[in-house]
From Swiss-Prot:
Coiled-coil zones: none
Pfam families to which the protein is assigned, alphabetical: Rhabdo_ncap (PF00945)
One Gene Ontology term, aspect cellular component: ribonucleoprotein complex
Source domain of life: Viruses
Entry protein name: Nucleoprotein
Gene giving rise to this polypeptide: N
GO-annotated molecular function: RNA binding
Family the UniProt entry places it in: Belongs to the lyssavirus nucleocapsid protein family.
Amino acid sequence: MDSEHIVFRVRNEIVTLKPEVISDQYEYKYPAITDKKKPSITLGRAPDLSIAYRSILSGFNAAKLDPDDVCSYLAAAMPLFEGVCPEDWISYGIIIARKGDKINPSHLVDIMRTEVEGNWSQSGGADVTRNPTVAEHASLVGLLLCLYRLSKIVGQNTANYKTNVADRMEQIFETAPFVKIIEHHTLMTTHKMCANWSTIPNFRFLVGTYDMFFSRIDHLYSALRVGTVVTAYEDCTGLVSFTAFLKQINLSARDAILYFFHKNFEEEIRRMFRPNQETAVPHSYFIHFRSLGLSGKSPYSSNAVGHVFNLIHFVGCYMGQVRSLNATVIQTCAPHEMSVLGGYLGEEFFGKGTFERRFFRDERELQDHLEAEEAKIDIALADDATVDSGDEDFYGGESRSPEAVYNRIIMNKGRLKKLHIKRYRSVSSNHQARPNTFAEFLNKVYSDDN
């Protein structure tokens, strides 16, 4: 009999079958480009820029914008922002430009056009007979791109924050080298009619293209990034959090991973560091893989690496970081166990690189300081009030070594010490906890009642 079959009895009948489950139709897709073809989209017929400008500006003022027309205009306006490539620009084997080449955002992607005409209307702008200047085009492009950033601001109690951001954006695009083309508060009013535009693939694609261009090319209108910067490492929260974590504890990726004492980290680490993905290559297509449509289900999101994400932010909470306290817990990824490991790692690395003497009069003074610090560590290891003298062999020569931390956890039977719980209570009780955040989790799990 096939080893994949099972046999059982139902109402005096012997049943033999092969258990099968639904295959995952939404597997993680890695962004690496293997066919050496630039990311591409298809838009309608390219418009006359002057007509398109007047039509889009009229629609902007009336808070009635057609997304297809906006995308067509944004693509047509790309040649206005020509710049010089500072170095050879190559990503995934694709030669984007050579050093000294004149390029504009359209050189980064392939934009194909059909013969479908846009719904262009000159109403509200027909009385303007002159052609708009480059500065006017830049202002309109900038305001349109800002619609993307505003649509990415979601959550409770964000109305005032969003309004303030929109006002600041308007100020940028009415100050030289830009020119004022709309009245105050128009951007926020129009955004309310376009609140979900970040979900429109073509619009997201063009916003990401502009951001990739201006992040590399020094340009008069580089401030256009104020509306596009959110496309960089979009849907990449897990990997971005891990990078910030390394800076916080001042370790290399390899050394940090040695502290990840949980079996569920294995698959996530393999997923996050798959070879040939250009995760560490500056100005790569990887940085904008989500907006450019290179990955439908990101392997680098917080949900894709939930155990890593939870651990990083529990360590951040222990260190009192507001960003971590406000982050959303991935409830399906062992938050209780991650909070225990986070407490031990937080204790080991808390304050490292914060209050330390770093500068000295000469090399001799530096050497004396290092020797004094080593002596302090030896004394602490000899009697740190937490380890029995007979257990010192578990700790080796370094209190922060992975072996030392691991053995402390095992000797405490995988439970937090009182000082860990006290610290968690302290940082969470002084913070206004939002629903489903790490602050709320710590308040509930490690409260006095529990």
